[in-house]
Amino acid sequence: MATTPNFTATVNTGADLSTQRMSAANTNRDGTGTLYLICTGGSNGDRVDRVQVKATSTTTAGVIRLFMRDASTNYRLIGELLVTAITPSATVKTWEGEFVRTDGQPLCLLKSGWALFGSTHNAESFDIVATVNGTF
């Protein structure tokens, strides 16, 4: 056991943010189908505290899914956000949501070689970004 606590050495901000634009429909909850890489654990691992999702156009009722993949390429569903039907305009913003834990713990810790992926249930366009994360 370490005698000093291990904090993230590099906070990923600005250009280091891991972002993807998702648009291919994927109704699977088992990690198959089209998935979009959000971030990969560095050589000493990564801590992810928050993942934000923002629609870029009109949405219909659907789901955004978050998966973790281990080094053996096993995918596990770790979260879902329900998307509501919204038609954006000058007075109505597009749908948005975030994956975040409410108990103060990180959303997930990615070991070296592990990765975080997202998918969208419907063929609609979403930007997904790990906005609060760091590399150990």
Model-found features: residue ranges?
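Short, surface-exposed beta-strand/strand-loop-strand elements in extracellular ectodomains
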Residues: 59-81
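Short solvent-exposed strand-capping/beta-turn motif centered on an Asx-Ser/Thr pair
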Residues: 54-58, 71, 121-123
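Extended extracellular/luminal ectodomain segments enriched in beta-structured repeat modules
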Residues: 42-50, 59
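C-terminal interaction-tip segments
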Residues: 2-44, 109-136
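Beta-sandwich interaction modules
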Residues: 93-113
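Buried hydrophobic-core signal for structured, non-transmembrane domains
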Residues: 49-54, 116-118
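Short proline/glycine- and polar residue-rich coil/turn motifs
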Residues: 83-94
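Exposed beta-strand and adjacent loop surfaces of beta-rich binding modules
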Residues: 48, 61-65, 125-129
